[in-house]
Swiss-Prot record:
Homodimer. Component of the CCR4-NOT complex; distinct complexes seem to exist that differ in the participation of probably mutually exclusive catalytic subunits. Interacts with MYB, ATF2, RARA, RARB, RARG, RXRA, RXRB and RXRG. Identified in a complex with ATF2 bound to target DNA. Interacts with NANOS2. Directly interacts with ZNF335. It comes from Homo sapiens (Human). Its main location: nucleus. Detected in spleen, thymus, prostate, testis, ovary and intestine. This is CCR4-NOT transcription complex subunit 9. The lineage of its organism: Eukaryota, Metazoa, Chordata, Craniata, Vertebrata.
């Protein structure tokens, strides 16, 4: 850790007074008395300060202060007593961690320190109250920012953790927004070759993913969401790239994806329509013979 004096310089586009303010707020994170306001101000400014992440990471005690904010609310998780005020405060800390997670200069160190694991207790929560929903969504946002970078090290790290079952649970029972971010994270893991191989490595893993995606399709046929459906279809399409998964999907792909159930929802979404057509084509083509030598019956 370095002192603030050696932190990465802020581009000169920021006025000198703003730069001094940023330094002041970062210093104020170290003190419990001034931390809450500093969290609020820095989270508001995070979009306009391109190098905020290195400044946070390399300044003394800052990351420890952000982690303290997270750990402080663990007792409010079970039993679930989290208030709106507590939720807003910790979500400001999470917003700053998201900034560190998505910056190329700090992402590797962020993973090496295993900081995402501090957020997993929040993803385990099931309370439907607004403070908890906001907490889950913001925590998912940090993981979403990591996978958005399409970096192999991110996927390798996540596969050593319980992120897939956590995402699957939120995909099954979260709010529409949380479901969308959780499905996006799963999609990004699947789009990586290591991630696809990991999920298709055992029948248990694949069947868990396929079961949840199937439930989501059923739910989406009753309460359509074009944005969520797009991610679900992309997950199915990517699974169909794996020969073993493709065979299984021939048996378990929901009928709603084969008929006109979603025609109205997708009428203006050419990308998802193309993915869906490709998925159906993949499942129809190249029916391989069973390794035991018995030809598989045509579907």
């Amino acid at each position: 850790m370095h002192s603030l004096a050696t932190a990465a310089p802020v581009p000169t586009t920021l006025a000198q007074v703003d730069r001094e303010k940023i330094y002041q707020w970062i210093n104020e994170l170290s003190s419990p008395e001034t931390r809450e306001n500093a969290l609020l101000e820095l989270s508001k400014k995070r979009e306009s300060v391109p190098d905020l992440a290195p400044m946070l990471w390399h300044s003394f005690g800052t990351i420890a202060a952000l982690l303290q904010e997270i750990v402080n609310i663990y007792p409010s998780i079970n039993p679930p007593t989290l208030t709106a005020h507590q939720s807003n405060r910790v979500c400001n800390a999470l917003a700053l961690l998201q900034c560190v997670a998505s910056h190329p200069e700090t992402r590797s160190a962020f993973l090496a320190a295993h900081i995402p694991l501090f957020l997993y207790p929040f993803l385990h929560t099931v309370s439907k109250t607004r403070p908890f929903e906001y907490l889950r969504l913001t925590s998912l946002g940090v993981i979403g920012a990591l996978v958005k970078t399409d970096e192999q090290e991110v996927i390798n790290f996540l596969l050593t953790t319980e992120i897939i079952p956590l995402c699957l649970r939120i995909m099954e029972s979260g709010s529409e927004l949380s479901k969308t971010v959780a499905t996006f994270i799963l999609q990004k893991i699947l789009l990586d070759d290591t991630g696809l191989a990991y999920i298709c490595q055992t029948y248990e893993r694949f069947s868990h993913v396929a079961m949840i995606l199937g439930k989501m399709v059923l739910q989406l046929s009753k309460e359509p969401s074009a944005r969520l459906l797009k991610h679900v279809v992309r997950c199915y399409l990517r699974l169909s790239d794996n020969p073993r998964a493709r065979e299984a999907l021939r048996q378990c792909l929901p009928d709603q994806l084969k008929d006109t159930t979603f025609a109205q929802v997708l009428k203006d979404d050419t990308t998802t329509k193309r993915w869906l057509a490709q998925l159906v084509k993949n499942l129809q083509e190249g029916q391989v013979t069973d390794p035991r030598g018995i030809p598989l019956p045509p579907q």
